[in-house]
């Protein structure tokens, strides 16, 4: 289990925490957010939209889809509304296993488990599906003979594919292991290939050349390739802020909000 926290390097989880207004972060993390703010002043809203997408997706899965077991890859630091809280509010018996190997997250992982005895944390590398799927706590907690939900929210855009495997390959390995009737939710930075592409590339440049060093904006086709063999839930791949919003839109979208998409699919 990772134990050393290098505070001189930015962490994905802590940068996210910074943008959400949290306190579990360090100067290197705050530097990334400040640099992003210079090219996209609305970066905090970008992050809030992503968290809201996670909550709406989880409510859909626990409510209408009837899912009561969740594998959440890249859990991040505990915040106001975590997956287990959103799921168990609708389905108290729901079991949630969080996966993350960020040392900061591992150090705080216990906080995610204090709520109840149906929430678990596994320090594993989400880019290694077999490491995750074969973990004893995962196999003991989740019943792979019944439908479950796999969440890959805000994770794969931090993988640059230089390791030889594509994001699509990684997701295919996860999806192959899921039973029929399972759901997959994914969110990702988008290069919209329109007037907002320049902003996407400026944000990508900041991510890649900041203390964080990762954050790739991919096209719709590249992102959809990460959902092989799944039946997409309406409205398909959509801006996170527009995926079944809580109400009518009263203000125009900010440019950065048009560079973050999410999708949910069901395995036949």
Question: Which residues are covered by each model-predicted region?
Answer:
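Conserved S-adenosyl-L-methionine
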Residues: 16, 231-244
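Core SAM-dependent methyltransferase catalytic element
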Residues: 243-268
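Conserved Class I S-adenosyl-L-methionine
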Residues: 198-221
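A short, conserved alpha-helix within the catalytic core of class I
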Residues: 129-134, 158-173
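Short SAM/SAH-binding signature in class I
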Residues: 142-156
């Amino acid at each position: 289990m990772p134990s050393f926290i290098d505070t001189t390097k930015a962490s994905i989880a802590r940068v996210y925490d910074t943008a959400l207004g949290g306190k579990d972060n360090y100067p290197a993390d705050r530097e990334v957010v400040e640099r992003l703010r210079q090219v996209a002043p609305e970066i905090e809203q970008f992050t809030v939209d992503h968290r809201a997408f996670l909550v709406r997706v989880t409510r859909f899965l626990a409510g209408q889809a009837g899912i009561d077991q969740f594998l959440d890859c890249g859990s991040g630091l505990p915040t106001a509304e975590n997956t287990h809280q959103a799921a168990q509010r609708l389905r108290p018996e729901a079991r949630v296993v969080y996966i993350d190997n960020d040392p900061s997250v591992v150090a705080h992982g216990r906080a995610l488990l204090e709520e109840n005895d149906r929430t678990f944390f596994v320090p594993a590398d989400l880019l290694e599906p077999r490491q995750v799927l074969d973990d004893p706590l995962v196999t003991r907690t989740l019943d792979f003979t019944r439908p479950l939900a796999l969440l890959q929210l805000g994770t794969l855009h931090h993988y640059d594919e230089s390791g030889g495997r594509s994001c699509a390959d990684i997701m295919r390995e996860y999806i192959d292991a899921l039973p029929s009737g399972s759901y997959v939710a994914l969110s990702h930075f988008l290069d919209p290939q329109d007037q907002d592409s320049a902003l996407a590339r400026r944000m990508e440049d900041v991510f890649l050349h900041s203390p964080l060093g990762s954050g790739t904006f991919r096209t719709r086709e590249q992102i959809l390739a990460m959902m092989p063999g799944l039946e997409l839930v309406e409205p398909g791949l959509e801006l996170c802020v527009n995926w079944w919003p809580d109400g009518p839109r009263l203000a125009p979208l900010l440019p950065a909000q048009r560079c973050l998409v999410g999708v949910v699919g069901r395995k036949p």
